[in-house]
């Protein structure tokens, strides 16, 4: 295969893979992330069935999302969409009183041309609650792009340059307050420890640099970890998009630097640059110890900060992963393509000693992922392994033929193809599991390898029992 002997990354494009989750599944993690929100999905029974099945595990938690089910009367324009949505939003306000209501458009609202953007401001004015419209429908390339659509819509609601100027004034006044407090303590002859306890951490812990906003939905502990990693380099994170509460959205505007933590947020990055005039830091994504180090180093270089202790920290993490690395070294992996995390995961697994045959990916924004692609190429060269072929919108039939030829030790695939591949002797891992797992930062690399090695460890256990085939002979010939 030509791509396997190439000295540079090879890009191909096939007919398209749409065997993936629907983007409205972003509701699953976003409603938990934004604690004062309510998500209203406007779609058909099919959307409702999908949400019930995909999110059914949270049925006892009284979730903050609901389904506005379109009926025949809605589609044939016999019912007034405005009145129906206003009634639902009024009911949501009475029952939950959220800080924001997010309307999630679906394929049906696109097809029947519902003017959600036109109705939202009028209803918002009447019920006095912000309404954000996000068209997270199945016409996207990958289900993770649902989050991209929601965050891009929320960018429009972020405070602007007025808030930024207020923050800079507050910063100056806090310094004055600190100096006056310090003088007061010296007058009262308090001991040094008491004076140190009142010292604002910002005055000592951070250098003076432009505001930095990070975008991408991550669990609270991971947000704290990444914020702390930058704090160790004396860099302050001004805010996260999305924030834990809608009322705490970060201020964005001219002079603000933004950096993404996920590879599927290209639309959000574009909106931040073009409409809010922010400056994008093009960094690899903080997935795995190597990616996290490169991410921090890139941010440091933009703010002219010399990174401290990153190499030692990365090496220490790799030492702690040695038990997993022994299982994956020399093994091969094939990405069928599902969630746009493929390039970052392939780069990390290459660093772990695996050989990546192919990276299938539903959609590739080469500008947004430029730094990640460069790091992948550099990693392959340093590890002395062939460059993988990158196939955008892969054709599943052709992929199956390539998998049969290559016989990889592991295929990372969508759920639709997992069982058929297992029946043909190919070990698989669901790609959707990487979406819901904590994979960002230095300390979560173990979670990635736990997912990757599980099918490999299962195979070793089955071989120990003498079970080398999960399917009877003769079944595969049918």
From Swiss-Prot:
Enzyme Commission number(s) of this protein: 1.3.7.7
Reactions catalysed according to its record: chlorophyllide a + oxidized 2[4Fe-4S]-[ferredoxin] + 2 ADP + 2 phosphate = protochlorophyllide a + reduced 2[4Fe-4S]-[ferredoxin] + 2 ATP + 2 H2O
UniProt: [4Fe-4S] cluster binding residues: 22, 47, 107
Top-rank taxon: Eukaryota
Keyword line: 4Fe-4S, ATP-binding, Chlorophyll biosynthesis, Chloroplast, Iron, Iron-sulfur, Metal-binding, Nucleotide-binding, Oxidoreductase, Photosynthesis, Plastid
Alphabetized GO MF terms: 4 iron, 4 sulfur cluster binding; ATP binding; metal ion binding; oxidoreductase activity, acting on iron-sulfur proteins as donors; oxidoreductase activity, acting on the CH-CH group of donors, iron-sulfur protein as acceptor
Pathway membership: Porphyrin-containing compound metabolism; chlorophyll biosynthesis (light-independent)
Keyword Nucleotide-binding: yes
Binding note for cofactor: Binds 1 [4Fe-4S] cluster per heterodimer. The cluster is bound at the heterodimer interface by residues from both subunits.
Annotated InterPro entries: LIPOR_BchN/ChlN, Nase/OxRdtase_comp1, Protochl_reductN
Localisation per UniProt entry: Plastid, Chloroplast
One annotated Gene Ontology cellular component of this protein: chloroplast
Cofactor(s) needed: [4Fe-4S] cluster
GO BP, sorted A to Z: light-independent chlorophyll biosynthetic process; photosynthesis, dark reaction
Primary enzyme class: oxidoreductase
Assembly with partners or alone: Protochlorophyllide reductase is composed of three subunits; ChlL, ChlN and ChlB. Forms a heterotetramer of two ChlB and two ChlN subunits.
UniProt similarity note: Belongs to the BchN/ChlN family.
Function: Component of the dark-operative protochlorophyllide reductase (DPOR) that uses Mg-ATP and reduced ferredoxin to reduce ring D of protochlorophyllide (Pchlide) to form chlorophyllide a (Chlide). This reaction is light-independent. The NB-protein (ChlN-ChlB) is the catalytic component of the complex.
Record-given protein name: Light-independent protochlorophyllide reductase subunit N
């Amino acid at each position: 295969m030509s791509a396997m002997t190439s000295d540079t990354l090879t890009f191909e494009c096939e007919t398209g893979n749409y065997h993936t989750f629907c983007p409205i599944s972003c509701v699953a993690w976003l409603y938990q992330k934004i604690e004062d929100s309510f998500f209203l999905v406007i779609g058909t029974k099919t959307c409702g069935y999908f949400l019930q099945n995909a999110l059914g595990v949270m049925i006892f938690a009284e979730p903050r999302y609901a389904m506005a089910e379109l009926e025949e009367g809605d589609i044939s324009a016999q019912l007034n969409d405005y009145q129906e949505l206003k009634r639902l939003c009024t009911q949501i306000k009475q029952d939950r009183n959220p800080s924001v209501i997010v309307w999630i458009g679906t394929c049906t609202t696109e097809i029947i041309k519902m003017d959600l953007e036109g109705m939202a401001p009028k209803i918002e004015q009447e019920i006095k609650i912000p309404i954000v419209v996000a068209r997270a429908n199945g016409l996207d390339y990958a289900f993770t792009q649902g989050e991209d659509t929601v965050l891009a819509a929320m960018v429009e609601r972020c405070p602007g340059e007025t808030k930024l100027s207020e923050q800079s004034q507050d910063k100056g006044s806090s310094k004055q307050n600190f100096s006056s407090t310090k003088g007061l303590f010296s007058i009262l002859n308090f001991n040094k420890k008491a004076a140190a306890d009142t010292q604002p951490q910002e005055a000592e812990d951070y250098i003076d640099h432009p505001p930095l906003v990070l975008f991408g939905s991550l669990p609270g502990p991971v947000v704290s970890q990444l914020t702390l990693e930058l704090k160790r380099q004396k860099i302050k994170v001004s805010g996260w998009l999305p924030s834990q509460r809608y009322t705490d959205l970060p201020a964005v505007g001219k002079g603000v630097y933004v950096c993404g933590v996920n590879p599927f947020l290209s639309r959000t990055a574009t909106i931040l640059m073009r409409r809010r005039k922010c400056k994008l830091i093009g960094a690899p994504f903080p997935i795995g110890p190597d990616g996290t180090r490169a991410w921090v180093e890139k941010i440091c270089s933009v703010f002219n900060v010399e990174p401290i202790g990153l190499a030692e920290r990365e090496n220490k993490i790799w030492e702690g992963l040695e038990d997993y690395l022994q299982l994956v070294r020399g093994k091969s992996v094939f990405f069928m393509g599902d969630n746009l995390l493929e390039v970052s995961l392939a780069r990390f697994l290459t660093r772990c000693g695996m050989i990546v045959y192919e990276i299938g990916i539903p959609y590739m924004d080469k500008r947004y992922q430029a730094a990640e692609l460069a790091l992948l190429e550099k990693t392959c060269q340093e590890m002395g392994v062939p460059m993988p072929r990158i196939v955008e919108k892969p054709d599943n039939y052709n992929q199956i033929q390539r998998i049969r030829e290559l016989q990889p030790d592991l295929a990372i695939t969508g759920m639709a193809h997992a069982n058929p591949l297992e029946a043909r002797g190919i070990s698989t891992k669901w790609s959707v599991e990487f979406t819901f797992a904590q994979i960002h930062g230095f300390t979560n690399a173990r979670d990635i390898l736990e997912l990757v090695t599980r099918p490999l460890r299962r195979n070793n256990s089955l071989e120990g029992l003498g079970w080398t085939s999960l399917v009877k002979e003769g079944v595969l010939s049918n």
